[in-house]
Amino acid sequence: MSKVLVVKSSILATFSQSNPLADHFIDQWREQHLNDDITVRDLGAQPVPELDGELVGALRPSDATLTQRQQQALELSDALIGELQANDVLVFTAPMYNFAIPSKLKNYFDLIARASVTFRYSEQGPERLVKNKRALILTTRDGIHKDTSSDLVTHYLRLFLGFIGITDVSFIYAEGVAYGPEAAVKAQEEAKASIQSFVSA
């Protein structure tokens, strides 16, 4: 039995191209893995706060008294990290917005990147503290960017996830969705077929 965490990051609600892919993954996984638990976190519907000068102080080891906002941020960070660590398969939607990931997903990453919790530094360099996970990235793009210099999303996600210890990372792309209705449907269908292959593997 596996535990699966699905993190949605689109801000477009019913107009999203990535949410249908996440929903398709959930349906396919439940169909083929009847006893597995799936947790869904929708950052578009329930965003996490952006770190500022006050909140970032709550995430660093310190004996200082925390403000109410800091305490809330620390508790949320603990909950998000606990959720991440409790699951075996991690699925992130990552639509490309202006060549980058959504700010809501970046805010989430900022809350789970905790020194001495998800990574730590030693004399040998950074040590990864998130173990035995595999991740799937569902990334949608208006244009065609895969394997080009404009695909900053793939590089960033591999770098960030690898830094905390998630090195088994697969990507499924739906590209050219702004090239017209037929192109969007084709991109969705191809991505859903790739999801089916991932789920069945």
Swiss-Prot record:
Free-text comment on the cofactor: Binds 1 FMN per subunit.
Cofactor: FMN
Pfam families attached to this UniProt entry: Flavodoxin_2
Binding sites annotated in the UniProt record for FMN: S10, S16, Q17, S18, M96, Y97, N98, F99
EC class (word): oxidoreductase
Reaction catalyzed: 2 a quinone + NADH + H(+) = 2 a 1,4-benzosemiquinone + NAD(+); N,N-dimethyl-1,4-phenylenediamine + anthranilate + 2 NAD(+) = 2-(4-dimethylaminophenyl)diazenylbenzoate + 2 NADH + 2 H(+)
GO molecular function: electron transfer activity; FMN binding; oxidoreductase activity, acting on NAD(P)H as acceptor; oxidoreductase activity, acting on NAD(P)H, quinone or similar compound as acceptor
Statement: the UniProt record of this protein carries the keyword Transport: no
Gene3D superfamilies: 3.40.50.360
UniProtKB keywords: Flavoprotein, FMN, NAD, Oxidoreductase
The EC number(s) this enzyme carries: 1.6.5.-, 1.7.1.17
Protein family (similarity comment): Belongs to the azoreductase type 1 family.
Function of the protein: Quinone reductase that provides resistance to thiol-specific stress caused by electrophilic quinones. Also exhibits azoreductase activity. Catalyzes the reductive cleavage of the azo bond in aromatic azo compounds to the corresponding amines.
Subunit structure: Homodimer.
The name this protein goes by in its record: FMN-dependent NADH:quinone oxidoreductase
UniProt lineage: Bacteria, Pseudomonadati, Pseudomonadota, Gammaproteobacteria, Enterobacterales
